[in-house]
Amino acid sequence: MSKTQAFRSLIALLGLIGVSIQIKQSGWGMLLYYTTLSNVIVFSFLTYLVIKEKRNGSINSNPKLLRLKGGVTMTIMITFMVYHFLLAPKVRSYDYYTIRNFLVHYIVPLSTIFDTLICDRRKIYRWFDPIIWICLPLLYFGFAIINGLLLKWPIPGTADSPFPYFFINMNKYGAQQVLINALVIALLYLLFGYILLGIKQMIGQKRQVTDNSSLNMS
C-alpha cells in the first residue's frame, strides 16, 4: 500500500468513525444532515479509490475519476465552510468540542482537500466541472425543503427540525429569504469550485509518463 493509499484509508476510517458516533449518539435521523451525507460520500468514495488503486494503479491516469473526486472534494469542502462560518458560532461549547464534531466538520473535510490538492494530478479539471459539482448540494437543498414542508421527518439536535439548518427554515424566514440564502451559498460554492480548478492548474502531481497499460505492454 502506497503512502497516498494509506492516507486515503485513514481519511475514510475517520469519516466512518465520525458518522458512526453521530448515528450511535443521535440516531439514524442524522443521515438527514448534509454534513453526515457528505462524510458518507467521502469515506465510501475513498474506500473505492483505495481498492481500485491496489488493483489498477494510481488514479492519476484516470481523468474521469479525478474530476469526480474534485466534485467529492467540493461536497465536503462546503460542509467545512458552512459549519465553520455559519453554524459553529451558534454551537454551545460542550457540543463544539467533541470528537465527532471535529471529525465530520474539520478533520475529514480538510484532509480530503489536502489529499486532492497534493496527491491528485494537476491540469485535469474542465471549465464546466464546478457547474456539475454543484448539482449534489442543489439536490440536497431540494430534498431538505421537501422534508421541511411535506415529509416532516424529524431531525435530531436542531430547533429548526424538520429543517436541518436555520438558514433554510422556510417556516421561520419565508421562501424569499431562504432562496436568497441558498443563492448566496451556491454562488460561493461555484466561486470556491473555480478557485480549486485554478489552484489545480498550478499544484499537484505531474502527468505520469507511463501508466498501467504501458507497463503491461510486452
Please give the residue ranges for each predicted region.
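N-terminal membrane topogenic signal
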Residues: M1-I11
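Aromatic-anchored segments of alpha-helical transmembrane domains
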Residues: L14-Q22, I76-F85, L136-I146
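Juxtamembrane "helix-exit" motif on the non-cytosolic side of transmembrane helices
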Residues: S20-W28, Y83-Y94
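Non-cytosolic membrane-interface motifs at loop->transmembrane helix junctions
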Residues: W28-T36, K64-L65, R92-V104, F128-D129
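Hydrophobic/aromatic-rich structural module bridging two neighboring secondary-structure elements via a short loop
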Residues: Y33-L37, I41, Y48-F85
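Hydrophobic cores of alpha-helical transmembrane segments in multi-pass inner/ER membrane proteins
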Residues: N39-K52, I107-C119, A182-L197
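Juxtamembrane non-transmembrane "cap" segments at the membrane-aqueous interface
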Residues: L138-F166
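Membrane-interface transmembrane-helix boundary segments in multi-pass integral membrane proteins
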Residues: P156-I195
